[in-house]
């Protein structure tokens, strides 16, 4: 059995990894792991005023803060029965267009395109595609300018408030945005032609279900009051849990979603599959020109879908501004005296369906539930990677699995910061520690480091295990007191794996053994690990990636007590494994 891992996914937002486990000729498991620390926004918002909640919730992520702002505003206004003015509605949609342009242009050109034109990154790609790199940057700046002008800042803007805005853009600012959008259109055409014309890999291909907001009135758009499924079903906003059915997996901070026990996808491709025929103008013509049924079965077509949405956004901006400027006067923000209520806000973030549900009791927030696009996509990400890995293995191309899985993950453009906010990890991921330890020691001789306090019962298990390993002749065993000034151990070219031996509270039965990557332990706040963070600061990044924790669940860490019998048995199990 072997594992092919991408420990750090490049060209995505946040800290995640993907791994495939291979047993003979079968890919037995694929894990899309999210190591990003949890945001805890849903808990931090409790007891706050609605105004504080509207300011706090978007801070779950700086990449798509406008989407979160619009989602929490829609939820709170539904909860408090606030009816938005037309002016405010138009300006919220305008800043939403800015975010889509900024996010999509950055992703398709800088993060995705190198995968399909043979370059490792956008900097290297600039030698052959200088125009594309430059125009992507200009489109990104334009999107940022819209968000800053309308919402006060392009990251975590505070101008959007319950019932409207603190202030509205001037006529001059809006006229400039409109003229600039029109000037961009020739380059937007080039973008659509480029990404719709790329030769995308046919691997993997599989049907899935797509979900997105239903804008209503047979329109294309980025928000609504119900959820449209590619099956033809429609789910009202307040019944969103009938779609998401969230659950937790042990290898990730993010919750997962399944509909009727099956994975589903959200994002640009979901919107184009479900709503693409509603596109009008030039975006509609380009959709008719390029869209085929094969888009539905291949996640790589998220990228041409994003290109079409960039065109839609550039066409929509002049329409929004023209309608706004025809309104005679700017209406002030709408106020309310409602103190208790519950509401759901549905919007499309660039990465897909974003759901905010907020409840207010006696003027204070009493419940918050946020469902992000990447959390919904995670199951399909694993499924598509599993399909691709198996097909490549069957074709005798195992060497291509790692790179292909990484490209698939990037096609979904996961926003890992958003997705990591909600899962409360009460149990460390359970692993087959014997197999993991065997695989490691078979290839290299690791350095073992015993960590702990021998005077505090089971907290001394790491030190005792290290002592017994030394006694039976296992080489290169150290104690924590020996490592901080060990220059050979921490030198830059150190390549050997390091295994820390320690008591690890992962909410299991006493004596339970687990074997985990050190990075996962450091980022998991539900695990006890006192010395490891300071030790990791001494490591370079390759060492950190090549370090592990062999943890034993303690029964007690009371001072003055001896090791418990279950922990002593665990020590013997490890000794027997290494001695063999």
What are the functions of these language-model segments?
Residues 432-555, 561-580:
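N-terminal catalytic or cofactor-binding beta/alpha core of small enzyme domains
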Residues 53, 366-368, 558:
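Short small-residue beta-strand/loop micro-motif enriched in glycine and branched aliphatics
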Residues 1-351, 361, 374-432:
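Active-site bordering "gate/hinge" segments
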Residues 370-372:
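A short interface-forming secondary-structure element
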Residues 356, 361, 367:
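A translation/RNA-centric and nucleic-acid-associated enzymatic feature enriched
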């Amino acid at each position: 059995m072997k594992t092919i891992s991408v420990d750090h996914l490049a060209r995505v937002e946040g800290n995640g990894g993907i791994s495939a486990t291979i047993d003979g000729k079968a890919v037995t498991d694929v894990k899309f792991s999210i190591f990003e620390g949890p945001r805890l926004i849903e808990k931090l918002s409790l007891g706050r005023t609605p105004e504080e909640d509207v300011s706090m919730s978007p801070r779950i992520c700086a990449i798509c803060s406008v989407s979160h702002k619009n989602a929490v505003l829609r939820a709170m206004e539904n909860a408090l029965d606030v009816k938005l003015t037309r002016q405010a509605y138009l300006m919220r949609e305008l800043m939403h267009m800015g975010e889509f342009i900024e996010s999509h242009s950055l992703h398709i050109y800088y993060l995705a395109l190198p995968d399909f034109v043979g370059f490792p990154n956008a900097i290297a790609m600039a030698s052959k595609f200088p125009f594309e790199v430059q125009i992507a940057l200009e489109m990104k700046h334009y999107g940022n300018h819209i968000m800053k002008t309308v919402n006060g800042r392009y990251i975590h803007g505070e101008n959007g408030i319950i019932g409207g805005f603190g202030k509205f853009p001037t006529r001059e600012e809006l006229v400039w945005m409109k003229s600039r959008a029109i000037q961009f259109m020739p380059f937007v055409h080039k973008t659509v032609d480029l990404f719709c014309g790329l030769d995308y890999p046919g691997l993997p291909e599989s049907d899935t279900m797509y979900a997105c907001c239903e804008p209503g009135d047979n329109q294309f758009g980025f928000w609504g009051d119900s959820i449209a499924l590619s099956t033809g079903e429609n789910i009202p906003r307040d019944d969103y849990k009938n779609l998401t059915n969230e659950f937790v997996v042990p290898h990730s901070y993010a919750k997962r979603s399944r509909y009727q026990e099956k994975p589903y996808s959200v994002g640009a491709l979901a919107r184009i599959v479900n709503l693409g025929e509603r596109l009008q103008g030039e975006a509609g013509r380009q959709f008719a020109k390029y869209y085929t049924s094969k888009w539905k079965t291949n996640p790589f077509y998220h990228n041409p879908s994003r290109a079409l949405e960039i065109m839609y956004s550039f066409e929509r901006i002049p329409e929004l501004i023209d309608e706004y400027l025809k309104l005679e006067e700017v209406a002030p923000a709408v106020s309310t005296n409602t103190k208790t209520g519950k509401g759901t806000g549905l919007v499309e973030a660039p990465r897909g369906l974003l759901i905010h549900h907020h409840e207010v009791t006696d003027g204070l927030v009493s419940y918050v539930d946020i469902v992000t696009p990447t959390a919904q996509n995670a199951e399909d990400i694993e499924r598509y990677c599993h399909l691709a890995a198996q097909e490549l293995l069957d074709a005798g191309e195992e060497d291509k699995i790692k790179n292909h899985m990484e490209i698939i993950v990037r096609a979904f453009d996961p926003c890992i910061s958003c997705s990591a906010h909600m899962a409360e990890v009460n149990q460390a991921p359970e692993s087959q520690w014997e197999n993991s330890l065997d695989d490691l020691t078979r290839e290299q001789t690791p350095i073992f480091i015993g960590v702990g306090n021998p005077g505090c019962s089971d907290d001394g298990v790491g030190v005792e295990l290290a002592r017994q390993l030394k006694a039976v002749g296992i080489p290169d065993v150290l104690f924590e007191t020996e490592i901080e000034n060990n220059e050979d151990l921490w030198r830059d070219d150190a390549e050997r794996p390091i295994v820390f031996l320690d008591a690890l509270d992962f909410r299991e039965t006493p004596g339970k053994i687990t074997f985990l990557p050190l990075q996962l332990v450091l980022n998991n706040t539900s695990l006890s690990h006192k010395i490891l963070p300071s030790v990791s600061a001494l490591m370079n990044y390759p060492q950190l990636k090549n370090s592990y924790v062999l943890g034993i669940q303690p029964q007690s860490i009371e001072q003055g007590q001896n090791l418990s019998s279950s922990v002593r048995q665990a020590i013997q199990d490890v000794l027997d494994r290494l001695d063999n």
